[in-house]
């Protein structure tokens, strides 16, 4: 932290309490500073306030009473904003979305498009959930006469993508693969 601030102070249209920094241990404060603070923020209370004001704003109108309550709840550690909200909400970096859901078509073009989409989604700050239920299982004939290797080898490619593309500056990408319970590869 750059300077020691104490007491209650107005910030972004609400009142924050710098004394609540004491509720966080050193590891938490260091992690917040390293990954979640935005430009001129020096304290966790400022990041909590930014996220609270962002979450209480709809179509350009901010409900400051709601923002104050959200700030109080997060600064008292009763709940915490998701990573994309705390790191990106109210800023110009990344997206304030926790999870994107996408569909994996059963074609080479569809798989290629899925990989490309994942690169952009992961680097924008959100986790990804991909539906693989339409991808043919291992050993099924393709229209070109070969046999499918199933969805699992293609999921390994997605895993490598998540290792390679970070969610902004906060963490590596995350991905959850979904399929139907009656899919032959389950």
Residues of each region from the PLM?
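Extended catalytic cores of very large enzyme megasubunits
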Residues: 1-186
């Amino acid at each position: 932290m750059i300077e020691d601030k104490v007491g209650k102070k107005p910030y972004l249209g609400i009142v924050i309490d710098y004394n609540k920094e004491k509720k966080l241990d050193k590891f938490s404060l260091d992690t917040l500073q390293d990954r979640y603070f935005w430009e001129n923020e020096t304290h966790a209370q400022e990041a909590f306030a930014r996220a609270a004001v962002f979450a209480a704003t709809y179509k350009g109108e901010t409900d400051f009473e709601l923002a104050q309550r959200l700030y109080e709840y997060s600064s008292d550690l009763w709940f915490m904003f998701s990573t994309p909200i705390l790191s990106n909400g109210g800023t110009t970096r990344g997206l304030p979305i926790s999870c994107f859901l996408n569909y994996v078509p059963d074609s080479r073009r569809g798989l290629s498009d899925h990989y490309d989409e994942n690169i952009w989604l992961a680097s924008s700050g959100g986790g990804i959930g991909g539906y693989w239920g339409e991808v043919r299982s291992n050993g099924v004939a393709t229209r070109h006469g070969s046999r499918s290797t199933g969805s699992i080898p293609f999921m390994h490619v997605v895993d490598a993508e998540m290792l390679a593309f970070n969610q902004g500056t906060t963490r590596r990408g995350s991905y959850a693969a979904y399929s139907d319970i009656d899919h032959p590869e389950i």
